[in-house]
């Protein structure tokens, strides 16, 4: 039992309810997880529930708002793929390091379903090592068209005028 386990089970019960309703197309279920911890349960739920056709897990699997921007040139070898100890207990998934259970692998397990790899702030697409991995995974399935992205602007330490701080998936993030 864990907080993430409870959250994922709650989301799966929500999907059960949706698909039990008349008029709901069970093949078009989308799970979106906004920033500040919502992306984690959205990503894990989509990974364990194949009824999810599209997932939009914000800030889960790759660089975090706290990551340097732009990413360093040696990011392939210097990036912390395990993530740091976080105050958000959903990010500290049990068994991540010893089991090789990296967040990007959870996100990658969604292939070949549709994924929007989403970031709250500016995103260094060219150097993001996880984006490169996700592109490879979706290409193995010959489903590159099922992989998209969304991102905001500015940095974590900016103000509302210079950065897309949010607690939901805002208009700036819906411009892919």
For the regions a protein language model found, what residue spans apply to each?
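Glycine-rich nucleophile elbow surrounding the catalytic serine of serine-hydrolase chemistry
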Residues: 33-46
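Gly/Ser-rich "nucleophile elbow"/oxyanion-hole loop immediately N-terminal to the catalytic nucleophile
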Residues: 1-36, 52
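Mobile cap/lid helix-loop segments that gate and shape the active-site cleft of serine hydrolases
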Residues: 9-10, 53-107, 112, 120, ...
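Active-site-adjacent structural elements in folded domains
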Residues: 1-2, 26, 39, 94-103
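Alpha/beta-hydrolase-fold serine-hydrolase catalytic core, especially in secreted/extracellular enzymes
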Residues: 98, 111-176
């Amino acid at each position: 039992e864990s907080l993430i386990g409870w959250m994922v089970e709650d989301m799966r019960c929500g999907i059960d309810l949706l698909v039990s309703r008349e008029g709901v197309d069970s093949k078009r279920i989308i799970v979106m997880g906004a920033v500040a911890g919502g992306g984690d349960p959205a990503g894990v739920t989509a990974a364990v529930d194949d009824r999810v056709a599209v997932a939009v897990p914000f800030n889960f699997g790759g660089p975090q708002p706290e990551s340097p921007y732009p990413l360093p040139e040696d990011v392939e070898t210097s990036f912390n793929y395990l993530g740091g100890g976080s105050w958000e207990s959903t990010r500290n998934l049990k068994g991540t390091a010893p089991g090789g259970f990296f967040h990007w692998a959870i996100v990658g397990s969604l292939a070949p379903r549709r994924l929007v790899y989403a970031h709250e702030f500016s995103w260094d697409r060219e150097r993001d090592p996880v984006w490169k991995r996700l592109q490879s995974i979706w290409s193995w399935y010959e489903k590159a068209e099922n992989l998209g992205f969304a991102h905001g602007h500015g940095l974590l330490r900016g103000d509302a005028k210079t950065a897309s701080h949010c607690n939901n998936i805002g208009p700036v993030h819906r411009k892919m």
